């Protein structure tokens, strides 16, 4: 993943990607997938929820159907994405790095990342951070894309994105000390036979 292997290049990519994000994101991820992520996070009206790599707020909207917006905290590395999200929702949007989350240990009941891990330079570190800030017994849920079936799309996508296998996601969760690990593979959707893996684990 040469384009995003360091923070500076990653930030530059995100800044330009934000211009087309709202057009590209729905092509990769359906509402059904986002709802499944939120369902697996076991959120209720009293939950304090963190979304990592929240983008412009697509998954945040699904979270807000279950818990008040003031109980949702969202972190994204791109100021342009945060600005758009703030126009959509009244959740707590914070500019920050998935691999160095600006929160104390054991802060949140549930921690979610949907459609962001594929752009992280170090996904294992990001999942460790998600586990760190989640309360004992809380859920960590990550949605990750599968490699595109079309060879032309795949060749382009592999230059800017990571496509972790289900086994790789489970290994990252184990490394982060998570237990009760589960996963769901979803598809077909648009151009893909199997599009995503949604992995969850309990702290």
Language model regions located:
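A short glycine-rich, Lys/Arg-flanked "PGG" loop and its adjoining helix->strand segment in the class I
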Residues: 124-136
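A short acidic, Gly/Pro-enriched loop at the edge of an enzyme's catalytic core
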Residues: 99-110
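Conserved class I S-adenosyl-L-methionine
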Residues: 1-42, 58-62, 81-84, 148-149
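Core SAM-dependent methyltransferase catalytic element
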Residues: 185-203
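Class I SAM-dependent methyltransferase SAM/SAH-binding core
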Residues: 50-100
């Amino acid at each position: 993943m040469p384009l995003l292997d360091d923070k500076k290049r990653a930030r530059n990519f995100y800044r330009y990607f934000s211009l087309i994000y709202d057009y590209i994101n729905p092509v990769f991820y359906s509402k059904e997938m986002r709802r499944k992520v939120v369902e697996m996070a076991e959120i209720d009206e009293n939950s304090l929820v963190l979304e990592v790599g929240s983008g412009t707020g697509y998954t945040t909207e699904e979270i807000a159907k279950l818990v008040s917006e003031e109980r949702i905290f969202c972190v994204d590395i791109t100021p342009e994405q945060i600005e758009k999200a703030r126009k959509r929702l009244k959740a707590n949007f914070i500019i920050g790095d998935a691999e160095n989350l600006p929160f104390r240990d054991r802060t949140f009941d549930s921690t979610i990342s949907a459609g962001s891990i594929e752009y992280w330079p170090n996904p294992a570190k990001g999942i460790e951070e998600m586990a760190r800030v989640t309360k004992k017994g809380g859920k960590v849920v990550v949605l990750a894309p599968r490699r595109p079936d079309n060879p032309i799309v795949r060749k382009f996508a592999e230059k800017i994105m990571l496509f972790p296998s289900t086994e790789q996601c489970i290994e990252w969760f184990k490394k982060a000390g998570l237990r009760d690990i589960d996963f769901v593979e979803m598809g077909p959707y648009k151009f893909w036979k199997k599009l995503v893996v949604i992995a969850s684990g309990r702290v």
